[in-house]
């Protein structure tokens, strides 16, 4: 089956292209990026947000299926639908579990209400509206599916939340602070596992017309993840709980998803256990450390060790893991 990937970066798209090729499919990429998407993968060097470029790629290459990796605005969703309509047999639209927002009832399934677009962040609002465009087309009979992804991690991740913890370990920190006893559970997905899930969602017979959550099957608390990073780097440290209103880290919120539908319809299973995925990610980070300009949303200075030490001294409670 010929599959066109619409958009894509050097982080996620190559893993999807590799997975497609390994399953006997023929991937191609429409992207302005000059990244290497793999041996023998055709690249249409055009703007995937340009309707004429998308239509030209679809009509000239004649893919059987399309994976929309942009899917971040309702306008982009409509553009993609117009290119697909009557020209491809099925399409898959990669959304995000951010559309659910904070939800005290976990695990969150696909029937859960999404946020009201007018009350959501700009990013979540645009995703919600894009999903609504696709859902309306599905109701009209379009053979499409939506896949809601968690926070991705893995080699070549340009943001790489794990650097917050890895840098501390590599610099020999013997203490680390986590908010609220590190009890938060934030659903993550190792990039190779998620690429496998994408291909399953594209090819499974039951997928068209459906919405699926995807994520790792094994979940870590923030404290467990912090411990796992240290162990993977052969480092030891003491983990201290500090008040959450005083200290932020990546993954410091609870949001995890019900995967039963993906398991049943797509036969999804983690092919690589998260521990191994984390070790691969950290090995890459050791070879490709992030620069001094690395940042994370809502954290003013992620490596303010003086402040971290002061919080531990004043408020810290050592965790027994």
Say what each PLM segment does.
Residues 3-23:
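N-terminal Rossmann NAD(P)H-binding glycine-rich loop of SDR-like oxidoreductase domains
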Residues 12, 194, 198, 214, ...:
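Non-catalytic, hydrophobic alpha-helical segments
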Residues 26-32, 36:
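Conserved glycine-rich Rossmann-like NAD(P)H-binding loop of the short-chain dehydrogenase/reductase
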Residues 34-38, 42-87, 99-100:
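NAD(P)H-binding glycine-rich loop region in Rossmannoid oxidoreductase-like domains
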Residues 96-125, 132, 136-140:
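Active-site "gating" loop of Rossmann-like NAD(P)-dependent oxidoreductase/epimerase domains
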Residues 131-156:
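Conserved beta-loop-beta element that borders a ligand/cofactor-binding pocket
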Residues 159-165, 178-202, 209-210, 224:
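Substrate-positioning beta->alpha
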Residues 200-259, 265, 292-296, 300-321:
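Mid/C-terminal beta-alpha module of Rossmann-like enzyme folds, strongest
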